[in-house]
A protein has these predicted regions:
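Peripheral, non-AAA+ core regions of ATP-driven protein-machinery
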Residues: 1-214, 218-224, 327, 468-469, ...
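Basic, amphipathic alpha-helical bundle interface domains used for macromolecular binding and assembly
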Residues: 40-45, 60, 67-77, 285-286, ...
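P-loop NTPase nucleotide-binding/switch module
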Residues: 167-205, 209, 236-291
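Short beta-strand elements
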Residues: 18-24, 279, 383-386
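Walker A/P-loop
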Residues: 214-256, 321
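Hydrophobic anchor at the beta1->P-loop junction of P-loop NTPases
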Residues: 215, 301, 344
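Walker B catalytic acidic pair
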Residues: 296, 302-303, 314
Length: 507
């Protein structure tokens, strides 16, 4: 007796189709699982056996073999419990074999209740691409999986409910897609921030062009507060960005029935004690790290010099390529990691260097040693560096309302729309000025004669690298877009240069 049931698996953040074959034959009773199963898959034997018996079926006292194809890919996790049960029951003749347009995923309890699994959305998308029309998943995963187009997703609470549906005795209603508007609510507002207009301006430029930014200032000046409000002025995520981001968070086990879709740009703020593997991703079965969880969003590193140097160096390649590769003996996995890097730091170890109160007792060598923890190549990849002054009492008590995130976002959205139209006309794939490919840089960043002269003088005086020069051009292009200027003028160049004048050698 033979049965074939379709299921799915996940490698990295991508799903793939799995064919589960169940074969019951004469011989000594036994239950073997083949096809590179890990320990969790092998343990499914006991869960499936108990679930079958506890739901009124007789477990076959025969020789049973379950094959998970393709056999050259390692199968991990508990998601094969449900398809294994369906395969055994159909091979034993207790239920009719499901059609080729059905797929099953889910972990079983001993009583036959379904428990959620990770990676529901990437598996649902893989099912849709494989031509599967109906996907049966645990009820807690249904809203997430229903975000995939062209697929009927059925929420299953337990084995009895599923068997009744397959026998057409009591049908399960397909899950509706999640409410995206509700998912995106609840981001803090810039209206809460008093003063610090120069920092708000720098963050507006960073948001408009997708630029990396470093905020330097004393404790309590509002660095973290403003950084956490940055997502509120970033452009809304497209559907494709939501899918990409949710896939990563789903594989990491960070989605939930209450919040199945990542509809607002993520903000990840790892502690400075994070390891290199925690930042980049890793594990025996590779899982995404903080830089991938920040994909399409913001990676906020507070107290930047306190991070270990080997951890900070992990950032260099993802900042250039927008992806990170994790290599293991079992294979290589690539995770997307296109994020905005937002960093904050004190001007010195004590936090009060240069403060008007005179509380700092650091020597010049102490300050230089503190700054030297950040490597030149990493600083070269930061587009804007802005100083946050200590907040004056009059500013703190000012009753005039501060500009809201919604008002700032309107200008950011307008600048991004200019960029999208420009890249579409030029045949480029970039989404914002920070990602302008080198081949398009000179064409896109047309500088006026006065601006070119200023840039030349700054290049010589500041001893800029080629990368720094390119990044100043990109920032100037964003400033010009915010001003709705076709060409980059000298004032745009001057403001862009201003954000690279913080001296890490003399401070």
């Amino acid at each position: 007796m033979f049965s074939s049931v379709k299921s799915l698996g996940v490698t990295g953040v991508g799903g793939y189709e799995v064919s589960l074959e169940a074969y019951i034959s004469n011989g000594l009773p036994g239950f073997d699982i083949v096809g590179l199963p890990d320990a969790a898959v092998k343990e499914a034997r006991e869960r499936v056996r108990a679930a079958i018996k506890n739901n009124g079926f007789k477990f076959p006292v025969s020789r049973m073999t379950v094959n998970l194809a393709p056999a050259d890919k390692k199968k991990a996790g508990t998601l094969y419990d449900l398809p294994m049960l369906i395969g055994i029951l159909s091979a034993a003749g207790d239920i009719d074999p499901p059609g080729n347009d059905c797929a099953f995923i889910g972990e079983l309890s001993l009583m036959g209740e379904l428990r959620s699994v990770t990676g529901a959305l990437p598996m649902a998308i893989a099912a849709q691409r494989a031509g599967i029309k109906r996907l049966f998943v645990p009820a807690d995963n249904a809203r997430e999986a229903a975000f995939a187009d062209g697929l009927e997703v059925y929420p299953v609470k337990d084995v009895r409910t599923l068997i009744a549906h397959l026998r057409a005795e009591e049908l399960i209603a397909p899950a509706p897609p999640p409410d995206i508007a509700a998912e995106a609510a609840g981001i803090p507002d810039f209206a809460d921030v008093k003063g610090q207009e120069n920092v708000k301006r720098a963050l507006e430029i960073a948001a408009a062009g997708g630029h990396n930014i470093l905020i330097v200032g004393p404790p309590g000046a509002g660095k973290s507060m403003m950084a956490k409000r940055l997502p509120g002025i970033l452009p809304d995520m497209s559907r494709q960005e939501m899918i990409e981001t949710t896939e990563i968070h789903s594989v990491a086990g960070l989605t939930s029935p209450a919040h199945p879709i990542v509809a607002a740009r993520p903000v990840r703020a790892p502690h400075h004690t994070v390891s290199a593997a925690g930042l980049s991703g890793g594990g025996t079965t590779p899982r995404p790290g903080e830089i991938s969880l920040a994909h399409n969003g913001v990676l906020f590193l507070d107290e930047l010099p306190e991070f270990r140097s080997d951890v900070l160096e992990v950032l260099r390649q993802p900042l250039e390529d927008g992806q990170v590769t994790v290599s293991r003996v079992s294979g290589t996995v690539t995770f997307p990691s296109r994020f905005m890097l937002v960093c904050a730091m004190n001007p010195g170890k004590c936090g009060w260097y240069g403060h008007p109160s005179g509380r700092c007792r650091c020597t010049a060598n102490d300050v230089r040693r503190y700054h030297s923890r950040i490597s030149g190549p990493l600083l070269d990849r930061i587009d804007l560096i802005v100083e946050v002054p200590a907040l004056e009492y009059d500013e703190l008590k000012r009753k005039a309302p501060a500009e809201s995130s919604a008002e700032i976002k309107k200008r950011v959205d307008a600048a991004r729309e200019i960029q999208r139209a420009r890249f579409a006309a030029g045949g480029g794939t970039a989404e914002c000025n920070a990602h302008i490919p080198p081949r398009m840089l000179r064409e896109v960043c047309a500088v006026s004669a006065e601006g070119e002269a200023l840039m030349h003088a700054a290049f010589d005086a500041m001893h800029l690298s080629a990368r720094s020069y390119d990044r100043i051009l990109r920032v100037a292009r964003t400033i010009a877009d915010l001003a709705a200027s076709e060409s980059i003028e000298s004032e745009h160049i001057a403001e862009a240069i201003q954000y690279r004048t913080y001296d890490f050698t003399e401070n």
